[in-house]
Each structure stands twice: as structure tokens, then as C-alpha cells.
Amino acid sequence: MASNAKRRALEPERLLEKHKEDEEDMEGDESEESDDIEEDESEEDEEVNEEVNIDFEAYTISDADYDGIKKLLKQLFLKAHVNISELTDLLIQQNHIGSAIKQAEGQDDSDDDEDDDHVFGVISLVNLTERKGTACVEQIKELILSRCEENCEQSLVEQFDKVLNDNSKPVGFLLSERFINVPAQIALPMHQQLQKELADSQRTNKPCGKCHYYLILSKTFMEATKTSKGSVGSQAKEELMFANAEDEFFYEKALVKFNYSVQEESDTQLGGRWSFSDVPMKPLRTAMLVPAERMNSIMDKFKEYLSV
């Protein structure tokens, strides 16, 4: 069980689990054996709409969360050359910041003890400037710069390169990942708590304190018929769909940003072969650099979004 040193109750969220109804009964006369099979299948495949109340709590990241965090990072990086095992270890080592989101204790919706420590989401930050030279950190920077070179004009590449390699203005890689069935409401208290922890770290001279910029890598989608290459403007923004709703507010406040396709890497369900309203969607990643001073206004926008 994860450490209870930093348990924070989050608002209970109502999740709707739907089990799809299979096929309708076949018309026409069937043999007696076929009728019996059809009756059995009809009973088994009857549509069930079940509402499940789940209370989430935020816990201090611990060794027990290793597999769960690694799985969440895998859905972000897919097949990119980033050592997510090392990155996961780093998040665990610096657990004075960040949270693992799990089901609240005392709920018995599952009979499987193995699910007791299931990680539904994680939020943390890696200070790329402080961790300069660490393999996974250098790989993250190389990933962003190489994809930028492949998809953007040289001026944008130079902007990203300058910010990522300016030791006088630290850059924090902001990680906020969760599974798709976890509602967006959970993200606001997670981000607010992280900002408090970062402020405390700066005040006490602990790692990951002051950041001038946040680097965010967001899971986004676009209609398969649209182009995603290059830097993105207002028209492209309207065509983007965000896996994490709050990422749109970071996008709006970003200093620079660009998209790149991960369609060739998304060969698993975690990668997200999505469709909306029967329209095939192309999976992307959107890289953003957001000035830290804009975080308060981003959180305000997110509050407005949740209040509607």
C-alpha cells in the first residue's frame, strides 16, 4: 500500500461503465439447438448500464507505484526513445513533489486485492535544468528538438532549443497523466497541490523548485484527413482535440508549440486509436512551452470550465 504521508481526498467522481450490447436476435426460424444458444447469448449479452461512485485520493508517490506510473508514461511516450524506467525511478526518488491518484481506502468495489494499489493517474515535475546530464532527461529534450526539426520551421526549432538549453531559466517538464475513464475534475486539485509543493521546494531549497518555463507534452487528436505538420495557429487549434481537457488551457497560454504525429507508434489501445462521431482520428503529440508566470491564469480558466 502506498504511503499515507500525503493523502488528500479528491472530489468523488461518478463514472459510467457501459457494457455494449452485442448482436440483436437473428430473424427467421432456427433449429431448436440454435434457439437455445441464442437465448443463452441474449441473457449474457443484455445491455447493462451501471453507475459506479469512486472516491479518489492523492498519495505520496512510492515504490509500490512503479508499475502503474510506468504504464501511464508508456501511453504518453509510446515508442519514443525515452528511458521511462529511469524516469519512473526519478519521480519516485523526488517524491516531495507529485502525487499518485488511487481509489480511496475503504471502497470494496473490487474483489481483486491486486487492484488495491492501482494507479489511476500521476502528476509530477522533472526539472530538466537541474537534472541536466541524466539520460532520460537528455532523451526527452532530444525527442522534442528532433520532432520540432522534422515538423517546423527553423525559427521555431531555435526557440525551443534556446529555452531548453538556457541554464539561467530552468525548465520543468510537467507530467500529468491519467487513464481516459478518470474525469477532468480531478486535474484541478492535482495541479493546485503540485504548485504548492513546488513553492515549498523553492522556499526550502529542495530540488524541482523554481521554474521559468513548463514543458508539456500533450496527447492530442485530429481528424485523419487534416494535416498536423508544423507550428499550430488558431485554425489548427480548433481542429485539435485534447485527451486531457485541461491541456487546452495550457495550449492557449503557450509561448510556442507544435504538433507531431504518433500514428505509426500507436499500435496499442494505450496509444489511443480514437474515433469521435465515427470520424477517424489521427493521434498526435503537442509540445508546448508555457511561462510559469501564466500558471495562475491557466488555473482560473480551468475553474471557469468546470463551473459551467
From Swiss-Prot:
Biased segments, Basic and acidic residues type: 8-21
Pfam families: BCCIP
One GO biological process term: DNA repair
Biased segments, Acidic residues type: 22-53
Ranges in coiled-coil conformation: none
Keyword DNA-binding: no
Entry's transmembrane regions: none
Domain of life: Eukaryota
Predominant localisation class: nucleus
Summary of the function given for this chain in its UniProt record: During interphase, required for microtubule organizing and anchoring activities. During mitosis, required for the organization and stabilization of the spindle pole. May promote cell cycle arrest and DNA repair.
Family according to the record: Belongs to the BCP1 family.
Name the record gives this protein: Protein BCCIP homolog
Source organism: Xenopus laevis
